[in-house]
């Protein structure tokens, strides 16, 4: 057959009369537009794709369940490329067969980040599969439906410089957390406490006496508030305080639900059957999220929740020995308190240590918060009234903390509801040295002993460090046991200080602030300068994460933020605001703020963008971010190889070379940067490899193990592989410096989770001497990006140091580091592919709402079998984007095999049901009227000029080549 008819009919036409047609278009079933834009809020009701109506940032973590399966828009491109690459193999019987690179094909499909979770309808009359568009419904025979996918076009706004074909780049940057806003960690008096002034004294030399209720400045029952002078007296240690539980309005409904469960349990005479652990866990998780929302929770939250439910069941059993002790009769004990005490024991046992507000698991921190509303300071109450103490098996033990009360709770400034002028406590965090003038000869070693008498300096503990090195030499790199905080001295240890735990209310002295409060801490090995102090809220809470909540906010520039290694001192969120489904809405000010950074125009001009927008589209910001990141990374890493430049020339470090000449493809993926670093620095190539080649190279290196990993690295980068092979025979520092490049292969990707929540990998730190340090990665320190790595690489040794002889220990350290990196599987954590791979449609739909609106379409492919095998794409869409542009974008779906796409047909249906047809390539069209009995419809006749179409099982065959 060389001709195909596609009927287009309106309401009143009997569909069963079109039973013989494989494709039909119902132009009368539509979604009414609003304000000239498609009403995407109706998507959940349509047979289209699965996007939930919720906040956009929340939608990023939605697991699509309301669908009929996933499709890959590029599956034909991938399988055709595999088909093109098949090789002839002759077996022993001289039989010739063809084999494709099955491993590559399977990897490409698994690695695709644009899977579409489709919701389809089944037409009862015609038994066709129905796909809804805003202006029509497309129905297709099930034999042809396997190549069908949506083609969403966010309409570009010329004033914003949109390049929506780069939406995938924005999606990618959010996943590697390089398109984020930040807020520094902050604290406030716990809203679950009423802190009441019980007595006062004139100065700290006058002790508080038991029973003394002397008041000087305040009346009886005065509650301490941070904006009241009672707070100043408390901080000065002049007020003796009593803590009582209080229920914040935000979680009143949840506490009411918990009270109902508690009362049922009490009325049943403590029947364990009344304790529904799953129900309790859900309520407690809600409490935890409402009071301190992280938006992105730990990957193993589900497993921990199950353990917590089991602990609840065990603790409420009537014959549990600990429960029996809690139920011993004492005057001050109440059944309601016992309920929360048992929950807290279960939570503590689940986490194997004391639970704090900053606990990463919502159900556990929710248990603490809910218990505080009833008990006040929970752990001191458990110790004093119920004789329960933290277990010696807990890590950390923290028994000494039972004697004090803790009145400050961590708040997330993204969500904290407070008026401007409200007093809080928050961290300041900045680079100790953002830029420095140096020469290659003098290098940029880390100054571990900065000259600042007023600051607290974070220092290495030589004894602990020596022990770690000894253990490394004798037993190899212990990725779970070696920790950076263990080799730092306790004073100023920025990895262990925690204001929530260090500021405490003592029984005799009032509030005791930690010794580091309101003092600068310089942590030279992290190039960090920090201070925690009192401050004020500058702006009200806003859905825009870029709003600056304090008067001394943390940096927002994406490259600077990547340099802030100590991620525990700030929160981040995608720089996105608004709803997932909206016709029209504003975007975050993030993009506008980024456009004001020095060098913004120069970076974009490298990408061919001449007209610099004042309020850019996120796709423009994404191009800027990745281009600047590539230049920055190349600059700092090239300092670690031997250079032929003038050694005594002064230059600024680190810097971005806007004029660095690079060829090949535009960088749209961080894997391209990683591969280009090795190509450029070691192989002297200036050509950027394609995104699929780069991602596959990184995967190949990760999948290999042992000597095979070195072989694969050498296959791709012969010079770098040679340097690795020389590490075991190294005699000078420069010859082992190449080991610091290896983390690049394992620490960053948009579709990995680290195997453990807090592992460490070895890295050299260049100071007055060479140190090997545990570079900690995982959900508590790093976020599957290079945040934990970059700033260490800003340091590099002087020429004299790098050419100096290795001592007797350093070669042993280098050999163990190499051994670790050729065997590590740190990147093999579990990942929810359903969540990660299905967000491209979400980004496109959201982008439409902040730019020019949405244009939607459905595309499928017709196989041509004669005279040459090829494809014709057929698309049904609205008329909002010119057909020629839509056709060019269909070709972009075939970056690997576009030669097989020989024709394109675009049928555009407007809101009134009128349509136009566009065709190119081997296909032509004609529009006719068709009469069936007393009914009439339009029919689009497609002519394939000497080509024959067919092969219903095309995709099935390609997937089985």
Swiss-Prot record:
Disulfide bonds: none annotated. It comes from the Viruses. The keyword Transcription does not apply. It is found in: Virion. Keywords: Capsid protein, Clathrin-mediated endocytosis of virus by host, Host-virus interaction, Inner capsid protein, Viral attachment to host cell, Viral penetration into host cytoplasm, Virion, Virus endocytosis by host, Virus entry into host cell. InterPro entries: Capsid_VP2_Orbivir. One of its GO terms (cellular component) is viral inner capsid. GO terms for biological process: clathrin-dependent endocytosis of virus by host cell; virion attachment to host cell. GO terms for molecular function: structural molecule activity. The VP2 protein is one of the two proteins (with VP5) which constitute the virus particle outer capsid. It is the major target of the host immunogenic response. Responsible for viral attachment to target host cell, probably by binding to sialic acid. This attachment induces virion internalization predominantly through clathrin-dependent endocytosis. Belongs to the orbivirus VP2 family. This is Outer capsid protein VP2. It comes from Bluetongue virus 1 (isolate Australia) (BTV 1). The lineage of its organism: Viruses, Riboviria, Orthornavirae, Duplornaviricota, Resentoviricetes.
